[in-house]
């Protein structure tokens, strides 16, 4: 069994979470001694582009396909559903040299990303034993923290610029994660970007 290290980038939009995650993935991949999973948990799919990967299928595509098959009664019980989900998720996983990428995608409907975030949480738990390091590029704000998507994270990296809004979002994320015990993390840190 692997002792997987999970690192999550969180913060306000536009502060450099995606760039930081991409640099971390590339640096670890260049070392070549770890099996890495990059998770593009931001619906804007920025990490995929930053890593130079064209994503054909996302977690949300799998979710929509699964919903359709359940409606059409093309799959049976819960075990059948889980087996199909497991198979489809490995189809979504893009292997790129020394790392793999999983993109959450952009839900088609209006409203919140609750269903796809819940699925993402289960996927992270399911896939973690197959990798040495998981790097998550989270969506902007506190949604994925509140929804416990990042329930088990070793290192919570709060990325911010020097603006009061960016620093406040980082502070709120840390408070929510700590005070509400929604993230079980070993360490947290603040990475300041765009310092002049």
List each language-model region with its residue ranges.
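Short coil/turn connectors at secondary-structure junctions
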Residues: 2-5, 32-34, 97, 130-132, ...
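Walker A/P-loop phosphate-binding motif and the immediately C-terminal alpha-helix
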Residues: 5-43
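Hydrophobic/aromatic beta-strand patches that form the interior of the parallel beta-sheet core
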Residues: 7, 37-39, 100-102, 155-157, ...
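Fold-independent oxyanion-binding glycine-rich loops
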Residues: 12, 41-42, 104-106, 138-139, ...
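Alpha-helical scaffold elements adjacent to nucleotide-binding pockets in ATP/GTP-utilizing enzyme cores
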Residues: 24, 46, 50, 169-173
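N-terminal phosphate/diphosphate-binding loop that engages ATP/GTP or pyrophosphate donors
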Residues: 30-96
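Cytosolic-facing regulatory segments adjacent to core modules
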Residues: 81-96, 100-138
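Conserved catalytic-core segment of NTP-binding enzymes
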Residues: 115-196
């Amino acid at each position: 069994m692997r002792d997987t290290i999970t690192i999550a980038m969180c913060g306000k939009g536009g502060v450099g979470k995606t760039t930081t995650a991409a640099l971390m993935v590339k640096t670890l991949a260049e070392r070549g001694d770890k099996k890495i999973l990059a998770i593009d948990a931001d619906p804007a799919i920025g990490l995929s582009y930053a890593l130079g990967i064209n994503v054909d299928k996302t977690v949300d595509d799998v979710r929509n396909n699964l919903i359709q098959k359940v409606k059409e009664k093309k799959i049976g019980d819960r075990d059948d559903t889980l087996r199909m989900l497991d198979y489809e998720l490995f189809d979504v996983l893009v292997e790129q040299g020394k790392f793999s990428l999983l993109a959450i995608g952009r839900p088609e409907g209006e409203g919140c990303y609750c269903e796809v975030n819940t699925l993402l949480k289960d996927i992270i738990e399911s896939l973690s034993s197959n990798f040495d390091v998981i790097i998550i590029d989270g969506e902007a704000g506190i949604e994925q923290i509140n929804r416990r998507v990042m329930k088990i994270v070793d290192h919570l990296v709060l990325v911010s610029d020097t603006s009061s809004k960016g620093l406040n979002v980082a502070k709120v994320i840390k408070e929510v994660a700590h005070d509400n015990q929604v993230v079980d993390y070993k360490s947290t840190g603040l990475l300041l970007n765009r310092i002049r």
